[in-house]
Amino acid sequence: MNDNKILVVNAGSSSIKFQLFDYHKKVLAKALCERIFVDGFFKLEFNEQKVEEKVAFPDHHAAVTHFLNTLKKHKIIQELSDIILVGHRVVQGANYFKDSVIVDAEALAKIKEFIKLAPLHNKPEADVIEIFFKEVPSAKNVAVFDTTFHTTIPQENYLYAVPRSWEQKHLVRRYGFHGTSYKFINNYLEKHLNKQNLNLIVCHLGNGASVCAIKNGKSFNTSMGFTPLEGLIMGTRSGDLDPAIIGYVAEQENMSASDVVNALNKKSGMLALTGASDMRDVFAKPQENAVAIKMYVNRVADYIAKYLNQLEGNIDGLVFTGGIGENASDCVELFINAVKSLGFATDLKLFVKYGDSCVVSTPQSKYKIYRVRTNEELMIVEDSIRLTQK
């Protein structure tokens, strides 16, 4: 058992992230293959060593085989059969997958069926699963879905007020994303607080960002919708807007609807408002970007207030996680101050260096406020072990 390894894979349209764990859940190596289809770049970190090299990756298969060969070359693994589990992050499982799943032909067919809902994500994820079937045939492959945690959202929160045939024929409804992160946060705080069935409002804030209302330990509502475009203002995504804008701009600019949606996904958000998609760059110019920062903060505050109301004011905590939520103290302070009328209170002195979590609410705060470091890869490892030990 000591030689057994678990690999976590996150495949995107032009990149693949890898993390290799031992069976005690310790990280052995991290790697990134990026610029697939273009010129290719490979990064590997292991045992306090770093490898960076330009490598041509004509496709995802070439990237996977290069990664596996590099693991053997540096003796991180002896044989490919050392990898007994491969956990794949899959973005879209629709409402079909209520749990993570050991991937067989039927599960793979379903993942492919949902490519139409998330073409940029599910297609490379399905392709990479098939690559691992071929390259590491002895390993079991587990799919862990961003959407699974949100399959508990009640109908009144997942339906859109559109013709019902759109849902019945085309699966148009709220799905929500970042579910693996929300599951990790919920599980972590259950252990940390020694309490089950928590009510939480969790803000996962990174370049992609969302908020989730957790009721009795289950997702009750979330800001992302049919796609990750809905909800908060993000690095390059617009978040909520009037859908009539899509048709109007398509007509005025002689663009297709999909071109407009692409612009809303990749050329909007903070990038459109400030010229920068990274919040560190935005906050480096607070006066110049004051309006954009106010818009960004207000949108997060709106969702916190909305979900506090939906949870009837009964929460065990407000949680900030993700790259911004975990690290940008000035940003988190703004979010909390924007909802201080609801009883939330913080003090910058509480924003000290911390390990996995810290409390940033003052004794005067009506509700506890936490910062918790999420770990989606560890959640995927734990799900993979759980399923294969059944």
Curated annotation (Swiss-Prot):
Q: Where are the coiled-coil regions? A: none
Which pathway? Metabolic intermediate biosynthesis; acetyl-CoA biosynthesis; acetyl-CoA from acetate: step 1/2
Q: What's this protein's function?
A: Catalyzes the formation of acetyl phosphate from acetate and ATP. Can also catalyze the reverse reaction.
- Gene symbol? ackA
EC numbers: 2.7.2.1
Show which residues form the site (Transition state stabilizer): 178, 237
Where does the source fall among the domains of life? Bacteria
Cofactor or coenzyme needed = Mg(2+); Mn(2+)
Record Pfam families:
Acetate_kinase
- Enzyme group, top EC level? transferase
Q: Where in the cell is it found?
A: Cytoplasm
**Cellular component GO terms, alphabetical:** cytosol
Q: Which Gene Ontology molecular-function terms are recorded?
A: acetate kinase activity; ATP binding; magnesium ion binding
Record: residues binding Mg(2+): 10, 376
| NCBIfam families xrefs | ackA
Cofactor note as given:
Mg(2+). Can also accept Mn(2+).
Classification via InterPro entries = Ac/propionate_kinase, Aliphatic_acid_kin_short-chain, Aliphatic_acid_kinase_CS, ATPase_NBD
Q: Which reaction does it catalyse?
A: acetate + ATP = acetyl phosphate + ADP
Q: Where does substrate bind?
A: 89
Set out the biological process GO terms recorded for this chain's protein: acetate metabolic process; acetyl-CoA biosynthetic process
Q: Where is the active site?
A: 146
Residues at which ATP binds: 17, 204-208, 278-280, 323-327
Which terms are listed as keywords in the entry?
ATP-binding, Cytoplasm, Kinase, Magnesium, Metal-binding, Nucleotide-binding, Transferase
Q: Report quaternary structure and partners.
A: Homodimer.
Protein name, please? Acetate kinase
**Family named by the database record:** Belongs to the acetokinase family.
